[in-house]
């Protein structure tokens, strides 16, 4: 059973999903890949994980970095999970390029245990920034797993499932212009 709840953010409606214990999805209403973890049987219910997630979002949209993370369970391929773990290391107010994530994955592949370990057999020297972009784009828990902090080469604001304007607004919230 999948449970859902809604959150009204300053940037628009957000849908939350849970398996009853952990957050499994967080999407801006209407974004690309919206509801990718939702099955046919969804029930609206106010669970403790939703209360905690709404508290996290309240702090975040107030312009502060939350000091806790709600419990999350993300379903995906080993490669996607490795990319999503790297996303979680991007600091509040910071950014990382798709190419930098690809390089980090290569380090994990060739150095043994690490974020990319086990995602693909054997060491690799190259990783496609496009492959990384595909995994970033399928991140089921927007904002908390900060895919909006991933930018193109040279800092261009590309490839956010909720659209470039929301990406710009989220980055501006974290790093306001002087």
Feature names for model-found ranges:
Residues 3-10, 64-178:
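Nucleic acid-binding interface residues in structured DNA/RNA-binding domains
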Residues 1-24:
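DNA-contacting interfaces and partner/effector-binding or oligomerization modules
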Residues 12, 28-31, 75:
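Histidine- and/or cysteine-centered catalytic micro-motif in compact active-site loops
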Residues 18-69:
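Compact structured core domains
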């Amino acid at each position: 059973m999948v449970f859902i709840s809604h959150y009204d953010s300053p940037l628009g409606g957000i849908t939350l999903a849970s398996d009853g214990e952990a957050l499994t999805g967080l999407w801006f209403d209407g974004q690309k890949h919206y509801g990718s973890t939702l099955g046919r049987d969804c029930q609206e219910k106010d669970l403790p994980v939703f209360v905690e997630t709404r508290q996290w979002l309240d702090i975040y949209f107030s312009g502060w970095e939350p000091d806790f993370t709600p419990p999350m369970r993300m379903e995906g391929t080993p490669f996607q999970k490795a990319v999503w773990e790297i996303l979680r290391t991007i600091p509040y107010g910071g950014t990382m390029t798709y190419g930098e994530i690809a390089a980090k994955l290569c380090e994990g592949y060739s150095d043994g245990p690490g974020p990319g370990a086990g995602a693909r057999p054997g060491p690799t020297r190259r990783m496609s920034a496009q492959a990384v972009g595909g995994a970033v784009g399928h991140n089921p828990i927007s904002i908390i797993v900060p895919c909006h902090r991933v930018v193109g080469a040279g800092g261009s604001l590309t490839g956010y499932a909720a659209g470039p304007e929301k990406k710009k607004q989220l980055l501006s919230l974290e790093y306001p212009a002087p």
